[in-house]
UniProtKB/Swiss-Prot annotation:
Topological type in the membrane: Multi-pass membrane protein
Record-linked Pfam families: Vps55 (PF04133)
Homology family: Belongs to the OB-RGRP/VPS55 family.
Assigned GO CC terms: endosome membrane; Golgi membrane
Subcellular location: Golgi apparatus membrane; Endosome membrane
Alphabetic keyword roster: Endosome, Golgi apparatus, Membrane, Transmembrane, Transmembrane helix
The organism's taxonomic lineage, starting at the top: Eukaryota, Metazoa, Chordata, Craniata, Vertebrata
Protein origin, superkingdom: Eukaryota
Protein name: Leptin receptor gene-related protein
Function: Involved in protein trafficking. May be involved in the down-regulation of membrane protein levels.
Length: 131
């Protein structure tokens, strides 16, 4: 039952993050949909982790080079997702208020993704591998 509560909490926080992103795009004052491109970063963020889990040997207690490379790529993706709306605001493609809403949405979404892997990445009976 604890896994279901965690899943509901994660889906709620994901909905809040996407609401911030949509508000940054769809409010009449902002009205520009360029920040929606951060959705690409949301989708590619867990891919290095998935590849590292499949390739690396879990018998090592220490961190492997493959896992460290996956952390590096994931960090680059997350930093790019935070930098993209700032660059759009600097070149005046979007307003700074929209940038703030998108950055708030980024923080909530990436914390949700991190929470997902912390809750369901343990490898117990109720894990993310079932989904």
């Amino acid at each position: 039952m604890a896994g279901i509560k965690a899943l509901v909490g994660l889906s709620f926080s994901g909905a809040i993050g996407l609401t911030f992103l949509m508000l940054g795009c769809a409010l009449e004052y902002y009205g520009v949909y360029w920040p929606m491109f951060v959705l690409i970063f949301y989708f590619i963020c867990p891919i290095p982790h998935f590849i590292a889990r499949r390739v690396s040997d879990d018998s090592d207690a220490a961190s492997s080079a493959c896992r460290e490379l996956a952390y590096f790529f994931t960090t680059g993706i997350v930093v790019s997702a935070f930098g993209f709306p700032i660059i759009l605001a600097r070149v005046e493609a979007i307003k700074w208020g929209a940038c703030g809403l998108v950055l708030a949405g980024n923080a909530v979404i990436f914390l949700t993704i991190l929470g997902f892997f912390l809750v369901f990445g343990r490898g117990d009976d109720f894990s993310w591998e079932q989904w």
